[in-house]
Amino acid sequence: MRSYAHSAAPRAAVLAAVLLLSFAALVSPSHAAAQAAASGRAPVVVELFTSQGCNTCPPADELLIELSARPDVVALSLHIDYWDYIGWKDPYGSPMNTERQRRYAEALGLRYVFTPQIIVDGRINLVGSRRDEVLAAIEKAAARRKALRLGFLPAGGGKVVIPAGHAPDEGATVWLAVYDKGHVTEVKRGENAGRTIRNANVVRSFERLGTWMGERLEIPLDLTAAAARGRYGCAVIVQQGRNGPILGAAAMRLDSLE
């Protein structure tokens, strides 16, 4: 684990093809995961804050690959940019992701941000490489009934349906994350020089769609451009405030658009 203080400034082709194909051979969902998906329960959101420039992140990246295969989990890889100065500029690092992580730190009362960090359902803060702790946190979050079950309509570029329900007094933020299925990167410099790193569900955009105050909402997503650029999927997250507990979420593959 590598920490970064708030006060500081932000931190072979054939082989790559083989590794990219190995995304299809991920660990299959557990029996509990399959039961959760079949029951129609809202999925658990797992956000990994990571960087290809951090040498403690690859085990967490591999764990997220495993989690991305589970139907009861919305697994997102958010690459931060504050480690870019230490030798390797992460090609997927973004100040948008760094800002989201900092907001979580404030909401959860943390003194600093660090990588690899996993946030489960906007509530639980974990070191992202501690697999057993992460899996236990997912099971704990799955047992907590969410307020909302979101749905997608694929026609016309996509639309998300948020049912009526009880909203927090301050309302809830509706987020849209668009992500790539996976990337394989041969790192040339920095702490991971010489390593080939795999990343799954790499977030490329994270935008606010609006505010939910308890009413039924149908929000057009206009994902045709993202699909044309080869993006793999999207997730809609309804979250108390801006970085509070997650009230509901759903994910959709963009190749399902009509």
Which functions belong to the PLM regions below?
Residues 10-11, 15, 35:
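Intrinsically disordered, low-complexity repeat/linker tracts enriched for polar/charged residues
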Residues 6-7, 39, 176:
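Juxtamembrane/transmembrane-helix boundary motifs in multi-pass membrane proteins
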Residues 118:
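Ligand-binding face of N-terminal immunoglobulin V-set domains in extracellular IgSF glycoproteins
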Residues 78-81, 121, 155:
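Short loop/turn motifs enriched for small/polar and acidic residues
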Residues 32-112:
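Active-site-proximal cofactor/substrate-binding loop regions of enzyme domains
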Residues 1-10:
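N-terminal secretory signal peptides that target proteins for export/translocation
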Residues 13-28:
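Bacterial N-terminal signal peptides
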